[in-house]
Amino acid sequence: MTMSLISDELGQASTKKSSVKGQPVVLRLQGAHRRGCGQRTGSHGGNNSRQQEDSMDKHFVLSKIKDYEAHLDNVAPLMESDDQLIMNELIREINNTCHVKIRGFSDLCDSYIKGAGSIIAKHINCFHSHLIRSALVFHLVGSKKHECGRVNGCEQIIWNLYNEYRNSVPFVDNSIMMEYDSAFAQLKSKKLLDQLVSLAQDPYLFSFFPQTMKMLARWRDPSMEKVIMGYFANPGLVKTQIAMSLGRSADDASILQREYSRWDSHGQYTVIICLRYYPSIQVLDKLMHFEALTVEDMEKNLSKCCTHNDRIWIKDVYSDRLFTIRKSITEIKKQLDIL
C-alpha cells in the first residue's frame, strides 16, 4: 500500500513508537496532502486568505495523524501475525471483562488494569515474542496502589517465563531483563530464593538484576553472602566466569568487552551495595582499600584528559562510584559502631 509522507511547512512527519517497545515507526499517511498550494500573491488580502487556508490544512492533517495513530495502536506493524491475533483476542477479552477501552499493546503496557492479571496469565505463554511477554509480567505481580491483585502462582509463572527466555538466546537483552528484575524485586517472594541465588551465582546475569540482588542481600541468606564475598574478593575470576557464561558469544571481542564493561560499571557496584548487609572489619578494610584505588584510578584518568569537558565527564563517572563506595563504608561503620 502506497503511503505519502507529510512534510513541508505543515510540519515534519510525526514519529510514533510502535506497539513493540524501542522500535520507532515513522508515521505515514495515505492520501493526506495540502490543499491550495498555489503561489502566494503579493496583496495583503491574498496573504490573509492563504493563512486561513494553511490553518485549515493543518487541522486536516492533524486529524489524519490522530486517525492513523489510533490505527497504529490497534495494529502493531512490527508484531508477528500470530502474536497480533493473540494480542487482539487478549485486548478484546480485557475490554469486555474489565469494562475498559484498551486500544492496543502500548495502552496495555502503560496501565494497571483491575482484573486483567488473570486474563493475561491465561494468554501470556501463547506469545512467541519474549519482548511482549516481559512487557506484560507486571500485570501478574499486581499493585496494591492500583487495587490490582497478584495472580495465583505468579512467582512460578514469571520464573518459567524468564527461564524460557534465558535458554532461548546466547546473550540477553537489557530491556527484557529490566522487566524481570523489577518483577522479582516487587514479588519479594522467598519461594524463589534458591532459583534467584542460582541466578546470582552467574556474574553475567548478576549485572542485569540489581534490584533483585539487593533484595537477596537484605534477606542475609548465607548462600547469597558467599556469592557476594566471592565476587568482591576475586574480581579477576569474575571475568573468567562471564566469558564462560557467554559461551561461543565470547569469541566476539566486542560482546565480551561490552559485558566486562557492564560488570565494571554496574555489577561490581551492586556487589558493593550488597556488602552493607554483611558488615565485618575485613569487609570494611577491603572497601577502604578499594576506595583508595578508585581515587588513584580517577586521578590517572584525569591526567590524560585533553579537554575541560573530558575532565567533567571523568569526574561525574567517578563521583557516582565513590559515592556508592563511601556510603557502604559509612553504613558498615554504623553497624560495627565504630564511627
For each predicted feature, which ranges?
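N-terminal alpha-helical scaffold/docking segments in eukaryotic complex subunits
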Residues: G46-S118, K304-T307, D316-L336
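Intrinsically disordered, low-complexity arginine-rich tails of RNA-binding/processing proteins
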Residues: K16, K21-N47
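Generic helix N-cap/helix-start motif at coil->alpha-helix transitions
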Residues: K64-H71, E93-G104, H128-V137, V169-Y180, ...
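Amphipathic alpha-helical scaffolding segments comprising HEAT/armadillo-like alpha-solenoid repeats
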Residues: E80-R92, I113-C126, H146-N167, S189-Q201, ...
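Surface-facing alpha-helical segments and adjacent helix-coil boundary elements at the starts of domains
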Residues: I94-T97, D107-H146, G153, N160-L161, ...
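Extended alpha-helical scaffolding segments
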Residues: A253, Y269-L336
